[in-house]
């Protein structure tokens, strides 16, 4: 049975307009994005099927073009549309951070970094560069591969901080394993970078590790 034949109060789009997006299930939100179903399946039925196939919303959103379009009802146009929506969400978060101090909203900062790094299949290391009012200027990925104290060069981090005329920055990297517990190497690297940047009067405010669940703040853990 198509969604159009459902009672208005049960249709995902009408429920969203009346109750807000947060009140909808993952399947209902995905159904609105899909707009239509396939033969024998409503958009909601198709959404439930896709969530089951991908084992949840996050793997579906993180799927590459090949995996995404291998599923019935999903083509290149939908993939492009989804990527555009997610990029707009990231840019919305970035704009908000440019208008206020990162220190006043650490949760939003961590959410932004998670949105940037959680889909990376390998370890990456980046910096969120801040101005003298702790507002975000830009984000850069500086290193890819195994992140340790011998691989990440302080000279390159200092160089990029000075190029952006940053007053402070937030270090970040991801753990593809999903476990955010910092290693001894993570702690040593943070100390080295903090000392090197202090020589050019750039302050390291935090080191955020992105994995599954909530990102870890090394400052909040008392590790720096």
UniProtKB/Swiss-Prot annotation:
Keywords: Hydrolase, Metal-binding, Metalloprotease, Protease, Zinc. Belongs to the UPF0758 family. GO terms for molecular function: metal ion binding; metallopeptidase activity. PANTHER family: DNA REPAIR PROTEIN RADC, UPF0758 PROTEIN YEES-RELATED. GO terms for biological process: proteolysis. InterPro entries: MPN, RadC_JAB, RuvA_2-like, UPF0758, UPF0758_CS, UPF0758_N. It comes from the Bacteria. It holds the Pfam family RadC. It comes from Pseudomonas syringae pv. syringae (strain B728a). NCBIfam families: PRK00024.1, radc. A motif (JAMM motif) lies at residues 173-186. This is UPF0758 protein Psyr_0222. Zn(2+) binds at residues 173, 175, 186. PROSITE patterns: MPN, UPF0758. Residues 102-224 form the MPN domain.
């Amino acid at each position: 049975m198509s969604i159009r034949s459902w009672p208005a109060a049960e249709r995902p789009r009408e429920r969203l307009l009346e109750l807000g997006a947060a009140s909808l299930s993952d399947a209902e939100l995905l159904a609105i994005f899909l707009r239509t179903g396939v033969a024998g399946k409503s958009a909601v039925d198709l959404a439930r099927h896709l969530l089951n196939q991908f084992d949840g919303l996050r793997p579906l959103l993180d799927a590459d073009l090949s995996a995404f379009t291998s599923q019935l009802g999903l083509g290149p146009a939908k993939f492009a549309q989804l990527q555009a929506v997610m990029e707009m969400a990231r840019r919305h978060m970035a704009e908000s951070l440019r208008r206020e101090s990162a220190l006043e909203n650490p949760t939003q900062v961590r959410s932004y970094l998670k949105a940037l790094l959680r889909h990376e299949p390998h370890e990456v290391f980046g910096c969120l560069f801040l101005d003298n009012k702790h507002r975000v200027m830009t984000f850069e990925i500086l290193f890819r591969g195994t992140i340790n104290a011998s691989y990440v060069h302080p000279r390159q981090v200092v160089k990029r901080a000075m190029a952006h005329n940053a007053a402070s920055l937030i270090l970040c990297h991801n753990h593809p394993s999903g476990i955010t517990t910092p290693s001894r190497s993570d702690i040593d690297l943070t100390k080295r970078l903090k000392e090197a940047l202090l020589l050019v009067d750039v302050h390291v405010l935090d080191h955020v590790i992105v994995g599954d669940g909530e990102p870890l703040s090394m400052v909040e853990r008392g590790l720096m």
